[in-house]
Amino acid sequence: MNVLNRNINNIFFIFAISHLIVWTLIPSLTNKNLPLDTIEALAWGSNLDWGFNKHPPMSAFFSQIFFNIFGSQDWAFYLLSQIFVVIAFYYVFKFAYEILKDLKLSLISVLLLVSIYFYNFTSPEFNVNVCQLPFWSMVVYYTWKIYNSKVVNFSDCFFVAIFGAIGFLSKYLFIYLLVSIDLLFIYLIFFKKLKKFDFKYIITLEVFIVLLVPHLIWLYDNDFVTVLYGLKRTGLEYGSIINHFYQPLIFLIKQFGILIPFFFLIWLLVKKIKFKFNLKDNKLLFLIAINILPIFLMLLTSIITGSKIRTMWMTPFYLFFGVFLVYLLKSHIDLKKINSFLIGFLFLFFLSPSIYSYVSISQTDKRTDYPGKEIALKAQITWSQEFEKEIEFVTGDEWKAGNLSYHLKSRPTWEGLTTDKILKDSSQFICIGDVCLGRY
């Protein structure tokens, strides 16, 4: 039995490493330039702060760490994305075993995620959505340990607070997971009386809030610009009564569309799709809280506000759907059909990078076809003809100026949009189109 378990663990690690290698190599070989969101994160990372006009700071922080190690090597940032994805897979695998107590089913729970395009096709672009993934999975894992233990361990509470704060500082929508977990514990402690309140829960909240304080101060000092940007992205300013029905319907249709390949793999694995919900089952209750409740809260947000929920915002929400469905259907899973499942899995595993490669090579007008290196070289030549010292800052939008900040050897700081004040305060500057380069 130990040999069998060791083999399954090895299969998981082979899958994880294969995923990491494939999705690092494919975009590295087929893309000419880093994607928009990654360039934005690098632009912010050149001038780190506790927040930025579009997002909280963590995606910029991790991007800058990798830049400090590897410099302007595109493959390093595709690798960064896949490290985050694979860490998430690892904690899904660990959690699945806690729930299922079967390594084969735990492995299947992770392999099912290959059918959800958030974890392959869109994963090369390191952004706030990918940045949430490992912390989402770790919060769920350590929350489960608290939920399933008779004695609450302080270290588990501490990890939930730390990873919850980092997740929230990656993207505010992380709050949907945290609220879902809170609602679960409130239900069990104050309504069902199935758990006792533990003061370590307060410590979790305190640590979480303390870690957010610098960002909250930054938000206040900057007129809550990040929050306003997020609200603008929902289309609330164009709201109408019909949006309270139309937007939730579109949201549901998109979620179903995303999961079609997922249900196809499930169909290959089971004898029949039949299950029943027993809310007295503590494991099932937890799985509903981390899988269904965050999506329901997102749907409820759309219904109440009429807001548009963008598809990519749902990136971390499906990490544990494999565990959820395998748990529901485990009595109907037919391991004799495992070969059919593996064929379907391998088909999707290779289909996604094949499509990515085809799109990347055949379409030549994408952001990833932007000649960032060439433009940076021309900008450097233009600067060098005027000045001897190196470039210290760039201004302009995150895309054009961010590419210059990334590709120029001096790694100039991105100072935001060009303003008269920045140029007046500089000792030297030149402007090329709508981008300016200068020295302090």
Whereabouts are the PLM-identified features?
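Signature aromatic-anchored transmembrane alpha helix within multi-pass, membrane-resident enzymes
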Residues: 331-359
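Short helix- or helix-capping micro-motifs
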Residues: 16, 109-117, 164, 168
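Transmembrane-lumen/periplasm boundary regions of multi-pass, lipid-linked membrane glycan transferases
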Residues: 178-283, 294-299, 304
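Transmembrane-helix motifs of polytopic, lipid-linked glycan transferases
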Residues: 79-100, 137-142
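Short periplasmic/luminal acceptor-recognition loop of GT-C membrane glycosyltransferases, typified by
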Residues: 365-437
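Membrane-interface transmembrane helices that cradle and orient dolichyl/undecaprenyl
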Residues: 97-100, 139-156, 329
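Short acidic/glycine- and proline-prone juxtamembrane loop motifs at membrane-interface regions
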Residues: 121-132
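Membrane-interface alpha helices of multi-pass inner-membrane proteins
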Residues: 47, 156-172, 183, 208-210
